[in-house]
Amino acid sequence: MTASAPITQDVLTLPRKEPEGGKINLVGLTRDRMRAVLIENGTPEKQAKMRVGQIWQWIYQWGVRDFAEMTNLAKAYRAQLEETFEIRIPEVVSKQVSTDGTRKYLVRINGGHEVEVVYIPEDDRGTLCISSQVGCTLTCSFCHTGTQKLVRNLTPAEIIGQVMMARDDLEEWPTPGAPKDETRLLSNIVLMGMGEPLYNFDNVRDAMKIAMDPEGISLSRRRITLSTSGVVPEIARTAEEIGCLLAISFHATTNEVRDVLVPINRRWNIDELLQALADYPKVSNSERITFEYVMLDGVNDSDEDAHRLLDHIKRHNIPAKINLIPFNEWPGAPYKRSSNNRIRAFANIIYQAGYASPIRKTRGDDIMAACGQLKSATERARKSRKQIEAEAGVNNS
């Protein structure tokens, strides 16, 4: 790795060590892993697959956290489960509600770390923006989250637990046996919170497979969007192993500018990224790629930039939508938002070329919940590497 290259996800990714003698958390386990731990702890092997199906529905379809409420299981078996297992999700530390209805949650995970989660209600959908890491390695210069150093990856339980936490707050778990209601307050997930999802690929994949499981939360893969800054080797895996919609934090049309705005571009440049994006819809059956483009005054918002962006997309034959994002300023930000007239002119060039170019409506900026503004309280009390290693049970002496 060269000195100028962004650090990768393995710098502070440490093995997690559960406290000895503690209960096993069933949240975040794959079906196969849940079956294995049930067998290891006394469930007859012939019954294990059926038990997984029953417990899975109670946890992910009905939102039940107490084994005693799982009434299609024998009382003795429920007691056995209670002795060994738990159903634990991240703890809500605080909740802020914007004047536009946006909700920002600060949630605490293992080790006392905190991440932020945002729920955005709209007329036709409700979108939950979730985090995949504590902090971030990418140091994108326009992003507040990028000023917080990476602490660690989130586990599958901590990722899917954000979805479960939001459903708790929205009181959206259905009653067992009640008629199915297709109207959802939480209908979409976007992996656009803290962290780079593709630097935590395996855990993100496992969590999203739980979200998509038809016997649980049951979200269509068309209602899940993963946003990446351009971890090129993992884009193909995302198409094959998750198959969700893909958004790319593009933000610049030349390598010179993107190297500054999105430093991962020094590792995989624009041409390498565009080739990976061109292949994605063929594998995932996605209709199009979303290009996210933050509008920065005098930096990337010229007519020439708009035409270059179109040239990139057309040259690689990428089915695309371009989301233009007015820059959400934060204390100490080195950039200013492009004027409304400049944003509209840029959008019109894209639109006249035949591409959708919606201008994202800023949501939750009064509570620092808007795009690029997330930064948890963990930054104010960030722990040293030795403290993190000690929590993880790693001894490097």
UniProtKB/Swiss-Prot annotation:
Annotated S-S bridges: C129-C371
Cofactor binding note: Binds 1 [4Fe-4S] cluster. The cluster is coordinated with 3 cysteines and an exchangeable S-adenosyl-L-methionine.
Compartment list: Cytoplasm
Residues that bind [4Fe-4S] cluster: C136, C140, C143
Record's signal peptide: none
Domain Radical SAM core: 122-366
InterPro entries, sorted: Aldolase_TIM, Methyltransferase_A, RlmN_N, RNA_MTrfase_RlmN, rRNA_lsu_MTrfase_RlmN/Cfr, rSAM
Main location: cytoplasm
Pfam families, A to Z: Radical_SAM (PF04055), RlmN_N (PF21016)
CC cofactor: [4Fe-4S] cluster
MF annotations from Gene Ontology: 4 iron, 4 sulfur cluster binding; metal ion binding; rRNA (adenine(2503)-C2-)-methyltransferase activity; rRNA binding; tRNA (adenine(37)-C2)-methyltransferase activity; tRNA binding
Residues engaged in binding S-adenosyl-L-methionine: G195, E196, S227, S249, F250, H251, N328
Gene Ontology biological process terms, A to Z: rRNA base methylation; tRNA methylation
Gene Ontology CC annotations of this record: cytoplasm
Catalytic activity: adenosine(2503) in 23S rRNA + 2 reduced [2Fe-2S]-[ferredoxin] + 2 S-adenosyl-L-methionine = 2-methyladenosine(2503) in 23S rRNA + 5'-deoxyadenosine + L-methionine + 2 oxidized [2Fe-2S]-[ferredoxin] + S-adenosyl-L-homocysteine; adenosine(37) in tRNA + 2 reduced [2Fe-2S]-[ferredoxin] + 2 S-adenosyl-L-methionine = 2-methyladenosine(37) in tRNA + 5'-deoxyadenosine + L-methionine + 2 oxidized [2Fe-2S]-[ferredoxin] + S-adenosyl-L-homocysteine
Active site residues of this protein: E116, C371
Keywords: 4Fe-4S, Cytoplasm, Disulfide bond, Iron, Iron-sulfur, Metal-binding, Methyltransferase, rRNA processing, S-adenosyl-L-methionine, Transferase, tRNA processing
Domain of life: Bacteria
EC number from the UniProt entry: 2.1.1.192
Family, similarity comment: Belongs to the radical SAM superfamily. RlmN family.
NCBIfam families: rRNA_mod_RlmN
Further remarks about this protein from its record: Reaction proceeds by a ping-pong mechanism involving intermediate methylation of a conserved cysteine residue.
Functional description taken from the UniProt entry: Specifically methylates position 2 of adenine 2503 in 23S rRNA and position 2 of adenine 37 in tRNAs. m2A2503 modification seems to play a crucial role in the proofreading step occurring at the peptidyl transferase center and thus would serve to optimize ribosomal fidelity.
Name this polypeptide is given: Dual-specificity RNA methyltransferase RlmN
Source organism per UniProt: Ruegeria sp. (strain TM1040)
